Amino acid sequence: MMIRFRKSQETDSIIIYEMASTSPGRIQINKKTKEIQILDSGDEDPEELKFIVKVYLIENDYPDQYTYAEG
C-alpha cells in the first residue's frame, strides 16, 4: 500500500489532507482535539486510515507532504 498525503487546506483549528492511493480521498484533522474525520476514504479501510493518519501525520506535527509505504 502506498499513500501520499498532501496538505490542501489549513486554518487555525482544522487541516485537510488529500491523499493519493489507488483511488483518491480526503481527511480532516481538528488540531485542537486531534479528532480525525474521514471525508472520503477512497479504497482504503477507514479504521486503518485513521491509524496511519495518527501515526504519520499527527505525531509528525502535520507535515505539508508525506508518503506512507507499507510492506
Report residues per predicted region.
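Acidic, low-complexity intrinsically disordered segments
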Residues: R26, K31-G71
